[in-house]
Every structure is written in structure tokens, then in C-alpha cells.
């Protein structure tokens, strides 16, 4: 069966033919390739076409597809352990590794996804503070938990919808919306309802309305307001953890969050998530405290082995981050040069190995409102051109591109050559 045949048959058994909406390429007006295999940064579809991958499973594969050390760990563990629903040494090893190597992490709880991590962190914050309301920011995406599906980023933003059917108003009545990088608005919000706020959750580097780094003074204001009103500050590092730096995005700011969520890279390509923070807060979790959260597959030994292999390799080869920064800078500078030479309005936001191309006339993209000025029709033309040229990029103006340690300068040169052909056609 070829790509089209598989996808058409998939529609008979899966809604839209996919298990996550953005994969169907609906907003791009085309069918997706059906991926068969991947190694390093090269993936191959069922038609036999190869692509240089800049999606990397939406961020987890910093080491590239099927890294030999990660695959070895998975194979060795799976020969003797798949799942027990019981304590294992591997979950201790990964938990200890993260607590000892990350800042502001005294204790950690393993879960199975980023959504589980963020929803559990919010529950814990509510249990710890005894308050109900949370603040999230328009354009930020924290998973598909009901309380987050309002003014969300990622696929919700891509499809141009305000939220989701099936989410009753009661589920979001305790969710307050902040404006990213707007100190005045967040101060007013706290002034009116600060005593009811349990937590502020934020992507310190947003990745689901495109890449936007929070302003330093904005993050400091959040920390100050949370301290003043007795709320917790939660950094959602599902995307940025171990990516923008080994210790994550919190190293970019002189700020200490109370809770941090992780996923993606920490699982080495397998389903994984975690939330972590100060001991006094984490011990409110059952069985130590009264905040209940559980999971049959949490701490799964195969996943723990993949995560431990991934993070250990990154720690022991910290220079890999310098390589990612180098090729990221080369890509960014090359794209800007080409766009200027061909009068294609373009802003590129990049933090380490994640970046977004914003097709906009603005001089900078720093807020959710800025993002909404982007030329989606031009992005669609760019996407289709690059896919035809053999590059896998996210099918949305509002998602990040990801780089890996396996990308080379040659891969970047090929991408720039293809982008130049696109830009010339846009004249």
C-alpha cells in the first residue's frame, strides 16, 4: 500500500485518519505522507520518498531518530521488563538523575505525557494553596486538559478555533487568561483576583504559537506577583526541557519556579512526562499527602531506560548543544539573508534548537497578537514547496521547527537552497 491508500483506509478506522489532529494536514489542504522509518534526521514514507526531518516527533528526538544508545537500552530492558505497576530501580535512577542534575528539582513524579504532567501540576498547586483559579496565557498550549483548552496554541490555534467542543463552561471558569509578555495586564489580573489564584502556568519559551521567549522583566513580574499573592509559578518545560539547554529554559532566567513540567526529550522518543519541584510542595502528593494522582504505566521500565539513556548521553556530551546552536545560527542567518534578497517579509525567532519562521511585515514577533498577523497563505505555499523538496516541517505557521545533534551543515545548506527557490518564486 502507498501513502494515499494507507491514509484513505485509515479514515475508515480513525477519526480523520489520525490519532492527533495536526497530523492530517487539514489546514494545508493536502494528504500527509505516511512515515515508515527513520534514522538520524532522515525519515522515509511508504512511497519510498526520503525527507530531512525538522519535526523530530514534535521535539523529543534531540538525538535524532533511533539513536543507537537509546535503542540498545530499550532492547536490553524489554527482554526482562515491559511493565509491572510496581517500584523499579530504573524509575529511581531516572528520578535521581533529574533531581541531581536539574535546578529547583527536589522531588519528581513520573507520568505518561506532557498533558498528564501539566494537569497534575495544576491539581497539586490547587491542593497546596487551597485556591482554585489558575492563570494561563493566550497562545500557550499545555495539553488537552479541559481547563487549558481556552485561547490555546498548537492545533487549536492552527485550526483557528477558540477552544473545544465538549468542554463545559464550568471546566474553564477557574481559568484566567493572561497576555504573554504584557506586564500591565497581568498586574491588573492579580489586582482583581490575585487572592483566588493557585498558580500561574507558562511556557518560558512559548513553542505552540510559534517560538516566543518570555521577556526577562515579564517573568520577574510573574515571580513577584506569585510571591505577593501566595500563588505557585509553574514552568511548562515539556518542549524546552533539555532542548534549549540541558537544564532547560529556566537557565535563561534568573528566576526559580515552584513547579516544572517535563516530557518529550526526557522520554527518548517513548511516551513520558514528569512534574517536579520543591519537596514541601511535592510531598502534598498521595501517598504522602492528600492530592491524588496515579497511573498504571507511570514509571514504566522501558520508558525509564530510554529516558535515562537519552539524558545521560546529553550530559556526558554537553558539547552537542554547541553544535545545535551553531547550525541553528547558520540556518537563521541564511534564511534572513535570502528573505531580504527576495523581498519576502520574514521574522525568525530562535532559542537554541527550536525556531519559527513568521511570515509577517512586523519588525518583531513578541506577543500572541503579533503571531496572528502572520500570512498563513504564504506559509502554506512555503510548506508545500519544502515538503516537495524533501523537508519535513510542521504543517502550521504556529509550531516550532526542531534541530537535532544529527543535523549537519550540509543538511542546513540543502534547506537554504530549497528555501531560496521558494523565495524567488514569491517575488
Swiss-Prot record:
Query: Could you say which enzyme class this protein belongs to?
Result: isomerase
Subunit description = Homodimer.
The places in or outside the cell where this protein is found are: Cytoplasm
Gene Ontology molecular function terms on file? glutamate-1-semialdehyde 2,1-aminomutase activity; pyridoxal phosphate binding; transaminase activity
Q: Tell me the domain of life.
A: Bacteria
Which Pfam families does UniProt cross-reference here? Aminotran_3 (PF00202)
Source organism per entry reads Clostridium botulinum (strain Eklund 17B / Type B)
Q: What is its EC number?
A: 5.4.3.8
Upper lineage: Bacteria, Bacillati, Bacillota, Clostridia, Eubacteriales
Q: What is this protein called?
A: Glutamate-1-semialdehyde 2,1-aminomutase
Amino acid at each position: 500500500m502507498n501513502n494515499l491508500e494507507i491514509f484513505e483506509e485509515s479514515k475508515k478506522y480513525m477519526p480523520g485518519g489520525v490519532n492527533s489532529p495536526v497530523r492530517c494536514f487539514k489546514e494545508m489542504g493536502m494528504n500527509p505522507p505516511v512515515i515508515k522509518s527513520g534514522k538520524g534526521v532522515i525519515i522515509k514514507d511508504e512511497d519510498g520518498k526520503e525527507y530531512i526531518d525538522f519535526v523530530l516527533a514534535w521535539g523529543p528526538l534531540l538525538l535524532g531518530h533511533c539513536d543507537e544508545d537509546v535503542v540498545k537500552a530499550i532492547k536490553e530492558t524489554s527482554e526482562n521488563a515491559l511493565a509491572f505497576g510496581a517500584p523499579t530501580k530504573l524509575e529511581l535512577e531516572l528520578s535521581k538523575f533529574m533531581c541531581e542534575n536539574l535546578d529547583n528539582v527536589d522531588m519528581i513524579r513520573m507520568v505518561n505525557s506532557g498533558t498528564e504532567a501539566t494537569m497534575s501540576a495544576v491539581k497539586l498547586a490547587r491542593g497546596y494553596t487551597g485556591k482554585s483559579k489558575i492563570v494561563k496565557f493566550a497562545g500557550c498550549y499545555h495539553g488537552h486538559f479541559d481547563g487549558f483548552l481556552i485561547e490555546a496554541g498548537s492545533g487549536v490555534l492552527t485550526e483557528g478555533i477558540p477552544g473545544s467542543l465538549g468542554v463545559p463552561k464550568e471546566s474553564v471558569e477557574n481559568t484566567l487568561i493572561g497576555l504573554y509578555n504584557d506586564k500591565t495586564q497581568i498586574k491588573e489580573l492579580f489586582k482583581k483576583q490575585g487572592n483566588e489564584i493557585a498558580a500561574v502556568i507558562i511556557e518560558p519559551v512559548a513553542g505552540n504559537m510559534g517560538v516566543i521567549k518570555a521577556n526577562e522583566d515579564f517573568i520577574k513580574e510573574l515571580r513577584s506577583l506569585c510571591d505577593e499573592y501566595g500563588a505557585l509559578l509553574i514552568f511548562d518545560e515539556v518542549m524546552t526541557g533539555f532542548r534549549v539547554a540541558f537544564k532547560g529554559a529556566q537557565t535563561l532566567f534568573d528566576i526559580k519556579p515552584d513547579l516544572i513540567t517535563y516530557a518529550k526529550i526526557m522520554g527518548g522518543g517513548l511516551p513520558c512526562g514528569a512534574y517536579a519541584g520543591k519537596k514541601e510542595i511535592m510531598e502534598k502528593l498521595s501517598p504522602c499527602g492528600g492530592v491524588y494522582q496515579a497511573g498504571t504505566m507511570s514509571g514504566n521500565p522501558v520508558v525509564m531506560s530510554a529516558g535515562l539513556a537519552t539524558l545521560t548521553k546529553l550530559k556526558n556530551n554537553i558539547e552537542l548543544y554547541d553544535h545545535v546552536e551553531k547550525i541553528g545560527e547558520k540556518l537563521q542567518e541564511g534564511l534572513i539573508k535570502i528573505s531580504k534578497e527576495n523581498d519576502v517579509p520574514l521574522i525568525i525567532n530562535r532559542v537554541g534548537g527550536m525556531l519559527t519562521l513568521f511570515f509577517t511585515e512586523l519588525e518583531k514577533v513578541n506577543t500572541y497578537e503579533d503571531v496572528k498577523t502572520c500570512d498563513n497563505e504564504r506559509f502554506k505555499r512555503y510548506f508545500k514547496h519544502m515538503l516537495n523538496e524533501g523537508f519535513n516541517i510542521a504543517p502550521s505557521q504556529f509550531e516550532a521547527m526542531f534541530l537535532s545533534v544529527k543535523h549537519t551543515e550540509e543538511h542546513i545548506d540543502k534547506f537554504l537552497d530549497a528555501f531560496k527557490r521558494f523565495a524567488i518564486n514569491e517575488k
